[in-house]
Amino acid sequence: MTLTEGAATATPPFDIDVLDPRFYDDPWEAYRWLRHNAPLWWDERNQLWVVSRHEDVSHISRHQETYSAAHGVRPKVAAPMSIISMDDPEHNRQRRLISRGFTPRVVRRLADHIRELSNQIIDEIAERGECDFVEDFAIHVPLIVIAELMGLDPDQRDRLYRWSDTMMAGDGHTDPDDPVLVAAAEAGAEFAAMCSELIEQRRADGSTDDLIGVLTKAFDEGALTATGEGAFAGNDRVDRTADILTPDELIMFLILLVVAGNETTRNALTGGLVAFSRFPDQHRKLLENPDLIDSAVEEIVRYVSPVMSFMRTVTHDHTYKGVRLKAGDRVFMLYQSANRDEAVFDDPDEFRIDRDPNPHLGFGIGTHYCLGANLARAEIKVVFTELFARLRDIRAARLDRIERGDSSLVLSIKHLPAVFTPESRFNPAKRP
């Protein structure tokens, strides 16, 4: 389909403000209208091109020479010195170094620990019959995994909880005097200071037992492994002095890991429980067919779309599908909408754990494909395997109102009351 300028500037029948966090409380009709009527729509209020179709989000994500991340991925927010706000070759340089901490081998080694951790958390709630799934469960798994990847002690882990939530709360706030943004900046500075101390400790003791140690070694030696498996798997090295990760780059990545890696997985877990609660037949299907867990994970990521949006900046004047785009124009990609595109997914608003094929964009696509995708998949898989094995009928207590935070970036579910039959009633062996 070729768009016309008229379609690009069409007036929707309802208010669409893609920078208003409340828009994402119930955006589905707006997404459908955009996909059908103006898939490349000019948002006059925010001075953005809004992109809603799977095909177009994929195209923009794959062509960084035309749609750059280097000018920032969030509107009205300065581009941080972070891997998500870089184009190649700089992006690829950092990605090659950082990816050593997230190989399939590393994730496989973590799987048993994630299972143990999940069961420890379930132990705390199993006899209660109810919980706040976010506060009592989903918040803990990804943060503890990240903390242990980083080699943090229990006290540092507790501070990490506070810093992560405070930094994420700053999303959507642009006034530098806003107390929420000030607090987020202070939390980021405190976290960075701790990371600097840890980097110096790893440098002093030479340890490569955790992610900070591995990446500190990458900084000091500028070395990549010959096998691509990284220092967690061995120390065969090829000396490449151009591949040096600076301390500031490492700290910025760790901030991204804590904020994005924690928040997105937390929301995938919470949104996954919402999806199973809305579609109880799919819950039953997974209980009866546990071998569907891998495809269920992919469907959770598609249906939930924990990351809702990102921005790119046009690098040169060109025409895309009949619409003239100018250098400096900002393009706002709606991943949630792309993952509900009728042109790609049959019955896209249905949650189907055996959906195949499932070419979702929940982890992105192209050069910025999520570095932590393997880890996120493992966490989601293990959590729902263990959760449904022990609390077989767990479900959201109510679905008419899901409480979200003030974010236009991530789903940001803040609370989710859940109910279930106490474990001992399903399994007498668990009775005290």
Predicted regions span which residues?
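Cytochrome P450
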Residues: 1-432
